[in-house]
Amino acid sequence: MAAPPARARADYDYLIKLLLIGDSGVGKSCLLLRFSDGSFTTSFITTIGIDFKIRTIELDGKRIKLQIWDTAGQERFRTITTAYYRGAMGILLVYDVTDESSFNNIRNWIRNIEQHASDNVNKILVGNKADMDESKRAVPTAKGQALADEYGIKFFETSAKTNLNVEEVFFSIARDIKQRLADSDTRQEAQPSITIKPADQSGNQAAAKSACCGS
């Protein structure tokens, strides 16, 4: 039987595709660069369409290869972004804690997920730029948590600049996806096998003869 598409070859146990979505300028590319390369820059060029990075991590003794796609937040690239939803196993919804409109638009991004992504896709809410001075904060932590609770998803505040919770957010969603895949494997293995026995030809012939005689 063919292996499920998320499974690995020799160098990893699981291949997990993640998608970063959210408005332009919320720091998706910075989060990706911090997690994949351990670096931060303020001179990012706005993502045009789609970009991705790969990082392999270890969880519970398993090697997890993360393929992380960074999407453009601009409206004109929305159709490109939605084309990548279907294959995503986990989606990080990112907003800027200093930009209330980016937070309010999270509901629109969730509607896009509901329209285009798989039903069982894992989601996580990320409030980025948490290192900014409190006087610049437009979205209180409690408000972000309340939205996450409303949708039944996890919530983290992060800073790509200071590396606050960046590892934690990616490891958290990867762990949840790995568990979902493992549970799916367990259910498949637990399904009883069905054996089809060959028909008793003599019995069938007798039945056919009896039916003939009775007609």
Swiss-Prot record:
Matching CDD domains: Rab8_Rab10_Rab13_like (cd01867)
InterPro entries: P-loop_NTPase, Small_GTP-bd, Small_GTPase, Small_GTPase_Rab
Subcellular location, record wording: Cell membrane
Record's keyword annotation contains Cell membrane: yes
Mitochondrion as UniProt keyword: no
Renumbered residue ranges of the record's region Disordered: 183-215
Origin superkingdom: Eukaryota
S-geranylgeranyl cysteine-type lipidated residues: C212, C213
Family: Belongs to the small GTPase superfamily. Rab family.
Protein name as annotated: Ras-related protein RAB1BV
Species annotation: Beta vulgaris (Sugar beet)
Origin organism lineage: Eukaryota, Viridiplantae, Streptophyta, Embryophyta, Tracheophyta
